[in-house]
């Protein structure tokens, strides 16, 4: 499936063509769809004081509502790189959400499938170890899931893959668009590894090596760091690679002059076989996150938060475990570079296989856009996200709800509440339970869960949507009672 593909642009990033070519192609394709996708593209780093470019693509409202595609952001050392990055993120999101909506997957249980499926154990590999028991695996074998054709990157063969199961766990992690399929695949693999390493370190609060800034020799990196440091921001550069053999570099930033508390102490990271590329990604990610937070808080009046998978830090004391660790020179990081994307992909796959991990690729290139887009999944990769901590019964319920099996879904929600009553204290889970109960015709149960939800989160009474939904349930309960009477 993957072919030899050589890099043709290597200034601060490695691509199959120049950013200018990417911009021209993306803009042309985004304007060829039946309804416009891109509303406008803006440079937003003027909200900050660093001077490294960040771009924002605003999505047409109709597309946003229909597909759930939000605004996309882009980063880079040059304005052209940042603009191309924002456009390609929009291509990625539009292509992949369109694929999820229109893929026409095979709906069946594992036990009925005679094709080349992935092992059922892989479906639980991303969850807590207590949920990987045979009892859960056996139940899962009989659940109807949605399957699509994927490509096993390790064994180089087609398989039947439960994409929607993993989407509910990993979200958009492992999504990428690129100038070629190989460029997109490498980017997707690096993102998964990056978030796996961040999540492992955050969840276990691991102490990892600190990279000596003076040991960094790349002039582009030194110039970018100078812009950050001269803005009064202190940085700590960390080796987040763990033992995977692929460089993951993180930056912890401390800004005593931060315009918002969300940016007082925060982190960002980057992964690439070439540590210079990994660190450049971490730098541009750090700057992009600042611009995103400032845009959300000061333009949209919405709360900002930590970078994806990172913990929220109030101050440096909160992040103390990240400031410790032995000091090492930058050239101690594992390093591999090759002019062919395919060779670098094979290098990463070999490192993953040594850790017992496999990667699966679903090509999602949109038929109108024609720009390579992928969803890559690595079952067992860690992600510091609530969905990876859910009881399997709740994940099963979500899958069944998605295909309209509401009574079966409600059964598993109730089973999850029996085994773990603490879920009844989580607003999002209660809301899902109330909705599922209503759709299953269990109106009394639905009303009970809505009442519990109000006790936990009374602010919902300020939502007209919630109030109307609650009134609808009450009316259904009384109608059901009168019918039976």
Locate each region found by the language model.
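Helix-biased "structured C-terminal domain" signature
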Residues: 1-485
């Amino acid at each position: 499936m993957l072919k030899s593909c050589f890099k043709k642009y290597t200034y601060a990033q490695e691509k199959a063509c120049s950013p200018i070519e990417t911009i021209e192609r993306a803009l042309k394709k985004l304007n060829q769809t039946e309804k416009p996708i891109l509303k406008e593209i803006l440079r937003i780093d003027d909200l900050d004081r660093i001077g490294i470019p960040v771009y924002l693509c605003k999505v047409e409202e109709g597309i946003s509502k229909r597909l759930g595609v939000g605004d996309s952001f882009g980063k880079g050392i040059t304005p052209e790189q940042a603009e191309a990055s924002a456009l390609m993120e929009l291509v990625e999101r539009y292509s992949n959400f369109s694929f999820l909506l229109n893929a026409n997957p095979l709906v069946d249980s594992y036990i009925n499938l005679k094709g080349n499926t992935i092992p059922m154990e892989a479906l639980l590999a991303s969850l807590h170890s207590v949920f990987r028991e045979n009892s859960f695996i056996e139940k899962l074998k009989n659940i109807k899931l949605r399957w699509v054709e994927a490509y096993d990157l390790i064994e180089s063969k087609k398989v039947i893959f439960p994409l929607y199961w993993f989407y509910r766990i990993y979200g958009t992690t492992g999504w990428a668009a690129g100038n070629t399929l190989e460029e997109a695949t490498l980017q997707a693999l690096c993102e998964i590894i990056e978030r796996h390493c961040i999540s492992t370190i955050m969840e276990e609060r691991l102490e990892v090596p600190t990279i000596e800034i003076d040991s960094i020799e790349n002039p582009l990196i030194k110039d970018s760091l100078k812009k950050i440091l001269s803005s009064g921001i202190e940085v700590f550069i960390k080796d987040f690679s763990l033992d995977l053999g692929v460089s993951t570099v993180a930056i912890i930033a401390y800004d005593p002059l931060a315009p918002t508390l969300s940016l007082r102490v925060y982190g960002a990271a980057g992964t690439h076989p070439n540590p210079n590329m990994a660190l450049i990604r971490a730098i541009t990610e750090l700057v992009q996150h600042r611009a995103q937070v400032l845009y959300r808080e000061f333009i949209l009046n919405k709360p900002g938060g930590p970078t994806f998978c990172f913990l929220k830090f109030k101050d440096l004391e909160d992040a103390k475990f990240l400031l410790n660790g032995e000091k090492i020179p930058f050239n101690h990081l594992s390093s591999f570079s090759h002019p062919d994307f395919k060779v670098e992909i094979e290098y990463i796959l070999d490192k993953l296989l040594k850790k017992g991990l496999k990667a699966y690729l679903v090509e999602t290139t949109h038929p109108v856009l024609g720009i390579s887009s992928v969803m890559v999944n690595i079952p067992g990769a860690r992600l510091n996200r609530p969905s990876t901590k859910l009881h399997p019964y709740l994940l099963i319920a979500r899958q069944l709800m998605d295909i309209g099996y509401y009574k079966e879904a409600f059964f598993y929600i109730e089973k999850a509440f029996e085994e773990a009553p603490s879920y009844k204290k989580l607003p999002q889970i209660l809301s899902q339970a109330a909705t599922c109960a209503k759709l299953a015709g269990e109106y009394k149960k639905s009303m009970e869960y809505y009442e519990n939800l109000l006790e936990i989160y009374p602010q919902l009474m300020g939502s007209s949507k919630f109030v109307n939904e609650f009134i609808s349930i009450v009316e259904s309960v009384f109608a059901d009672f009168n019918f039976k009477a």
